[in-house]
Amino acid sequence: MPLSRLIINDFRNITTCDIQLSSGFNFVIGPNGSGKTSVLEAIYLLGHGRSFKSSLTGRIIRNDCDELFIHGRFTTPEQFELPIGINKQRDGTTEVKIGGESGQKLAQLAKVLPLQLIHPEGFELVTDGPKFRRAFIDWGVFHVEPAFYDAWSRVKRLTKQRNALLKTANSYRELSYWDLELAQLSEKIDQWRVDYINHISEATQQICQAFLPEYDIKLSYYRGWDRETPYAELLKKNFERDKQLGYTVGGPNKADLRIKVAGTPVEDVLSRGQLKLMVCALRLAQGQHLTEATGKQCIYLIDDFASELDSHRRQLLAQYLKQTKAQVFISSITAEQIADMHDDESKMFEIEHGKIAQG
């Protein structure tokens, strides 16, 4: 479902804006420091309940203001208008509205607004620790498997309880009750993740063939413990070691997605421009699977589109984004950098000092 309207109040350097959006490409053009990234950040906040640039609410609320508001309107497949909104206050209080109803959860907001972000710091997906790739996998599973969110939340609570018990337990018997449910849920989560990676691997490789034809890129999934060992057996076997360490060593919270070229991690082979295309391929494959599995379209947020990409690679990425028929928001310093993508269906917005005007 594309956003048809976006209203931003007191976010970063934006006092207020109210813009009508294209269901296709939307370009936000402006010099560095103008606020163009803030527009994408506001949309991300609307879908995730948090910023991708700061974890501190006080830093994203405009100076001398006590709260921020971001509102959006969707056009549903039935052509109804669905309003959504988020309000954040300096004390950390957050209120979410969906369809005019207050008290909604952030997970519900994320479900109705599936967003994919590609930004200059996005290399962390392939270059940094496993937590970024787990988040990547779990974003996808969350959107296609309705039971995932509750199951994963329960696993995290059970693991926390288990870690607390490890500090006082004298025998494994004291943990066996908790471990039974933990093992069952962990195996279920693992299977959902396996199925998901199997679904997106082929799409990722196909997109990589277009973006990076000189490389044969392979994805492999590590579940967080030995593939041949049932998790219940591992928990019992590792009790003494876990007790000594004070936490549970293996489990679904240690899962990883390994991305390699001829057996070598991609970050040791690809240039920065190629790594950006690798990240784009992963995000686009997720969006493709989301549409195939649910009928929903991703919304793509691409901050600093031209960064790390030469004109040929920019053109490749733009062509693929157009093929998705998804709604896309792109920030750029100059209109020349995105001239080839602009058409009659797209909209261009110029921003300077936090003030937005349609170009």
Swiss-Prot record:
InterPro entries, alphabetized: DNA-binding_RecF (IPR001238), DNA-binding_RecF_CS (IPR018078), P-loop_NTPase (IPR027417), RecF/RecN/SMC_N (IPR003395), RecF_2 (IPR042174)
Task: Give the record's keywords alphabetically.
Answer: ATP-binding, Cytoplasm, DNA damage, DNA repair, DNA replication, DNA-binding, Nucleotide-binding, SOS response
Q: What cystine linkages occur within this chain?
A: none
Q: Which residues form a coiled coil?
A: none
Offer a single GO CC term for the protein: cytoplasm
SUPFAM superfamilies per the record?
P-loop containing nucleoside triphosphate hydrolases
The entry assigns this protein to a family as follows:
Belongs to the RecF family.
Its job: The RecF protein is involved in DNA metabolism; it is required for DNA replication and normal SOS inducibility. RecF binds preferentially to single-stranded, linear DNA. It also seems to bind ATP.
| Protein name per UniProt | DNA replication and repair protein RecF
Q: Which organism is it from?
A: Aliivibrio fischeri (strain ATCC 700601 / ES114)
What lineage, starting at the top, does this entry show? Bacteria, Pseudomonadati, Pseudomonadota, Gammaproteobacteria, Vibrionales
